[in-house]
Curated annotation (Swiss-Prot):
Family: Belongs to the RTC5 family.
Source species taxonomy: Eukaryota, Fungi, Dikarya, Ascomycota, Pezizomycotina
Keyword presence, Cytoplasm: yes
Protein name per UniProt: Restriction of telomere capping protein 5
Summary of the function given for this chain in its UniProt record: May be involved in a process influencing telomere capping.
Length: 623
């Protein structure tokens, strides 16, 4: 920037800066038709006070069709009021005038890139955090003091002191406030107004916190709107929320929020927010984008019905953008709920797996309680699916002392248990849900595992966590039938080489040693073992959650439900159906030959056609 622009900046008032940015968003981020629709929507619902048109909290909630049962209206309105003041945090909360609301829509739909060149996702998340946070030096200071107390034991007592917010303890770059305001700086820079930033337009995220209750309500809404399209109303997505559905949303929201370590803290600090979102919930806020795209479609407006009220603004003559016609009977988000997977857990999965591979794209392949808990049934139902799959397993922690011979046999095949469970003793009756995203077709393992670097291991309950594949080892997924070691289904445990397997087989009992971060289901599909060693070094990275920093655990659990879902459209399902039909025809042919049809002449002809006997009833040639 030149000298002249620096002199011009101080003459711009905050109102002028806000107006200038809104005008640039309008001219560069939207088409004329989209702007017309936005203006129509705003004017049709705006209240007026002292000549100023604005939207109130009830108006925003009514337009977005936010369910009253979630109580999230005030949280979302607070966020919008903050974003409406962008890029001047000192002016927040802003009155939601037409210009302020346009800035809100621009930021939440991520359309600001044509004006603000720095488009990093982290910068966008930082603005969302600020919109949700409250600034209380007393609360944040008490948390920082606790961080400092926890930082020292974390370094020396890895197992028990990993709980807490050690990652929020002061680190290099803690005081780099300019870095915290890059998006604000970029917006001001686009208007040659960086001088305003130097005069006090800063909002240090390290002196703030998102209240737990507010965050919980927002996560409930995000679970509900995760599958929404820009042309789909929230009322059509969830026409009525039953008490059971609200309770389910709340339960899963608690699981997700627990990943932020809020049990012993009043809220979520920025460092924890940024770390957890980046590591385990990268798509958490994606649903806000299509929700706020609703402002760009004028619904139920007919230009033939013009207002003649002289006090109303003159009506433009631009045509309205009609929302695309909705399909009367759209394909369901999930063909049918499983014993583990339902709509709410599907939304939870979409927070770290792309939604376009999940919603309306899943097919139930295998259910242990329906098809039988056996490796053969699993193979028959899953192996013909030539696309990615999602494996889900649910169970409860086994008691420390075996209560029957089956549990004793499991204990005998494992080394003595040194690691604690992931849940405290008082909560050991809680349901565990682990799972995996397998990007490749299933197969028998043989000498090497299958899967690739996009394989994901995860936990959905009682805490949300994601363990991404590493490049250190490629022992991603295996499917082994005895005597191949280790027998069963699993991820993250190395397959013994042929020589070592032979050496091990000479022992009367072969101990199974799980990988550092691994999931193993025994070959009876009766028990599961999830192991987490924070030092890592295996096929999957250890947990990146601050609350689990340097924490080791091993869950040995009895399997209650096991499911596999196929990711893919109708074409993949049709290919699988044809494969199953072919296999069924082959099996039927073999049964008719082996068991007989009851007609001796027909049996003889079938055997002759198969080359098993010759015309004189002697055995067929094998040459």
């Amino acid at each position: 920037m030149g000298q002249g622009s620096s002199h011009d900046a101080p003459h711009l008032t905050p109102e002028q800066l806000s107006h200038t940015l809104a005008q640039r968003f309008a001219s560069k981020s939207y088409t004329p038709l989209e702007l017309y629709c936005f203006s129509t929507v705003f004017r049709s619902l705006a209240d007026t006070s002292s000549g100023v048109r604005y939207w109130s909290e009830p108006t925003l909630c009514r337009f977005l069709e936010l369910p009253d049962a979630l109580g999230v209206g005030s949280v979302l309105f607070q966020m919008c009021s903050y974003l409406g003041a962008f890029p001047l945090p000192s002016q927040a909360p802003a009155i939601l005038t037409q210009e302020a609301l346009l800035k809100v829509v621009t930021i939440l739909t991520e359309r600001y890139g044509s004006v603000i060149k720095r488009r990093g996702r982290e910068l966008w998340l930082r603005e969302l955090y600020r919109g949700l946070a409250v600034y209380d030096r007393g609360v944040s200071a008490s948390i920082e003091e606790e961080h400092e107390r926890e930082a020292q034991p974390v370094a020396t007592e890895g197992e028990s002191s990993g709980m807490g917010f050690a990652i929020d303890a002061p680190e290099d770059g803690e005081g780099d406030e300019d870095e915290d305001d890059e998006l604000v700086l970029a917006a001001l820079d686009s208007m040659d107004a960086v001088e305003v930033f130097k005069q006090g337009e800063q909002a240090n995220v390290h002196h703030s916190i998102i209240p737990t209750d507010n965050f919980l309500k927002l996560v409930e809404l995000l679970l509900l709107i995760a599958p929404i399209d820009a042309q789909q109303s929230l009322s059509s997505l969830a026409p009525e929320l039953s008490d059971e559905r609200v309770e389910e949303l709340r339960r899963v929201a608690h699981v997700i929020v627990s990943a932020f370590g809020v049990e012993n803290h009043p809220g979520v600090t920025y460092r924890t927010f940024n770390t957890v979102i980046s590591a385990a919930l990268p798509y958490l806020f994606n649903g806000l984008n299509p929700l706020f795209e609703h402002f760009l479609f004028a619904k139920d407006f007919d230009l033939s019905k013009r207002k003649n009220d002289p006090s109303s603004p003159s009506q433009d003559t631009h045509p309205v953008i009609p929302p695309p016609k909705t399909v009367m009977d759209p394909e369901p988000l999930l063909p049918q709920p499983g014993e583990i997977l339902n709509l709410t857990l599907l939304s939870q999965l979409s927070f770290f797996l792309k939604g376009n591979t999940l919603f309306r794209r899943l097919r139930p392949l295998y259910s242990g309680n329906n098809h039988g808990f056996s490796m053969g049934s699993f193979e028959k139902q899953v192996f013909n699916w030539r696309a990615p799959t999602i494996l889900l397993v649910k169970g409860r922690v086994l008691p420390a002392t075996p209560s029957n011979t089956r549990e004793r046999a499991l204990q005998d095949m494992l080394p003595p248990k040194r690691l604690p469970n992931s849940v405290p003793e008082s909560q050991e009756n809680q349901t565990l849900i682990y799972g995996a995203y397998i990007p490749t077709q299933w197969k028998h393992t043989g000498k090497t595992c299958f899967g690739d670097e996009s394989t994901v291991l995860f936990q959905l309950s009682p805490t949300h966590d994601v363990f991404k594949a590493s490049k250190f080892s490629t022992d991603y997924v295996y499917f082994n039938k005895s005597p191949t070691q280790p027998p069963g289904i699993g991820l993250g445990t190395p397959i013994p080489t042929q020589s070592s397997a032979h050496t091990h087989s000479s022992h009367s009992q072969t101990l199974f040693r799980p990988g550092p971060v691994s999931l193993h289901l025994d070959d009876a599909l009766e028990f599961g073992i999830f192991t987490h060693v924070s030092d890592g070094g295996g096929s999957f990275h250890p947990s990146a959650l601050p609350v689990r920093k340097r924490r080791d655990w091993q869950d040995r659990f009895e399997i209650e439900s096991l499911e596999v879902w196929g990711c893919g459209g109708d074409e993949v399902a049709e290919a699988q159906r044809k494969e199953w039909a072919w296999q069924e025809r082959e099996a039927e042919a073999r049964r008719r030959i082996n068991l007989g049809t009851g007609d001796q002449e027909l049996d003889r002809e079938l055997l002759k056609m198969a080359g098993i006997i010759s015309g004189d009833r002697s055995g067929g040639s094998m040459g």
